[in-house]
Amino acid sequence: MIRFLQHSEINPEKWNQAVRNSLSPNVLSEYELLDLLTGDDTWHALVQDDYETVMPLPTRKKGVLKYVYTPFFLPQMGIFHRQELPQYKFDLFLEEVSEHYVLADLLMNEQNTWDWKKGLTPYFVSYALFLHLPYNELYSQFHENTRRNIKAAQKQQSQVTLQEEKVADIIALFRNNRGQGENVHFRDDDYTRLQRVSDYLLEHNLLEVYGVRTAQNELAAGALFVKDGKRRWFWFSGRDNQLSETKPMFLLLDTYIRDHAESDLELDFNGSNNPNVARLYQSFGGTRYPIPFHRVYKNKFWRLLLTIARKGSMQ
């Protein structure tokens, strides 16, 4: 039986166990982190039986209308299940979502690919790199241009730091550079939320902080990697555009891969809709995989109404 639970009805311990024991565990979808990621909003959930299968539903309101959204800095959501989930059960979860919301934008996870395999749903793309090989073998899989950029960065005599940079400085790098682009929609509250989540992750030894400083000790780039079991999320990064000629991000990622080579870890580049960023991830030997996206409407009336409203807002 699938139940809709309000936030206050969710058992935190059972929730976390369900996510951790699923086929697609994700520390950022655990109870405490969902609380931080949703901030002033909230989240509810669909729960099957005694937390055998769970689905988080971050919730916002526009007027009297409730809808599900994907919070910034949450790489994947979807349905968390311990065993293979049949198509009909997947459909039941989506139908249950439509019973409670007029609209739901659902970013799934790599185990929720039924409709994607049939070509019935759009998807985002991510890249993952298994780090079990020796560094030299991993390096040999980098694209030629990437190896060239790494060598150029090494000639700059920049230094890579570990757990020395402040998260706030890396956030500022992004905010003052790429964050000024018209396609970036982060608000002040989003940056504040990112800092709070980072503080929690640091406190629980779940965050690796890498930085690159030039020969003049200027912070050229920084990145935050989330430790999630055997997965490492390339979660957030920033770069100083004025120091881009030093190729700091190439040096940073190369160093991270070198540091973690010959381990049972997987580096997940966390995807990007920016084709230039996606090419960067692929150039480090990452393997492409899909993250399905579902848009669920309460009924045909709401689908038509919301489609008209969206078109009107674009004019």
Label each region the model flagged.
Residues K61-Q76:
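Conserved acyl-donor/pantetheine-binding loop and adjacent beta-alpha core of acyl/acetyltransferases
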Residues P75-Q83, Q242:
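The substrate-binding groove and active-site-proximal loops of carbohydrate-active enzymes
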Residues P86-S126:
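Non-catalytic accessory segments adjacent to catalytic cores
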Residues Y88-E95, R196-L304:
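Aromatic (often tryptophan-rich) hydrophobic motifs at membrane interfaces
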